[in-house]
């Protein structure tokens, strides 16, 4: 079994990280202890590509694009290429990431894609009684359409996000 997590927030010494990064680190290391291969792919804080092994977890941090207005496109393209390269070497069974993570990634046959609902754009727009940003809303809906399954951090997040799936 090989699981690939998508996050830009995997803890890195000297850089802040939040709940997403802590969650992925905790579950990734536990999965490794159960002999499950784990890769983490995300964008780097530094302007370089980096790959390292941390407690059995392969962490790949990709240099961020600086192309104004199209960084999202080039970043997604590079993440997709990285996933494809990993999959050719060690087939991935599951790719898991937060709400927006699948929007512009090409799907690879035989991989299951899962979205982990932590509270995405639609969720917080509703909770804060504000409008949906069209671009973020578009990305989230596109991402949701690509998912084979969803998991949520709570029943509250699940029930309030379900209407947007």
Regions found by a protein language model. Give the residues of each.
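N-terminal subdomain of nucleotide-sugar transferases
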Residues: 1-47, 55
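Active-site proximal beta-strand in glycosyltransferases
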Residues: 3, 94-97, 107-126, 151
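Alpha-helix capping/helix-boundary segments
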Residues: 46, 101-102, 156-158
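Conserved nucleotide-sugar phosphate-binding/catalytic loop shared by glycosyltransferases and other
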Residues: 48-69
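Nucleotide-sugar donor phosphate/pyrophosphate-binding loop at the beta->alpha transition
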Residues: 77-78, 123-142, 146
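Short N-terminal targeting/anchoring amphipathic segment
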Residues: 83-102
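A short, active-site helix/loop in glycosyltransferases that binds the activated sugar's phosphate group
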Residues: 143-165
């Amino acid at each position: 079994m090989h699981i690939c997590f998508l996050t830009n927030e995997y803890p890195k010494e000297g850089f802040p990280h939040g709940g997403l990064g802590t969650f992925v680190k905790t579950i990734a290391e536990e999965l490794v202890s159960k002999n499950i291969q784990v890769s983490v792919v995300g964008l780097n804080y530094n302007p370089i590509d980096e790959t390292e092994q941390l407690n059995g977890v392969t962490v790949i941090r990709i240099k961020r694009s600086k192309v104004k207005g199209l960084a999202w496109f080039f970043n997604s393209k590079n993440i997709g290429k990285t996933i494809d390269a990993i999959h050719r070497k060690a087939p991935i069974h599951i790719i898991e990431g937060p709400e927006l993570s699948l929007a512009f990634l090409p799907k690879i046959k035989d991989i299951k894609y899962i979205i982990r609902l932590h509270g995405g754009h639609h969720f917080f727009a509703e909770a804060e009684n504000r409008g949906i940003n069209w671009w973020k809303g578009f990305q989230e809906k596109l991402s949701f359409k690509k998912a084979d399954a969803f998991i949520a951090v709570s029943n509250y997040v699940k029930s309030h996000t379900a209407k947007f799936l």
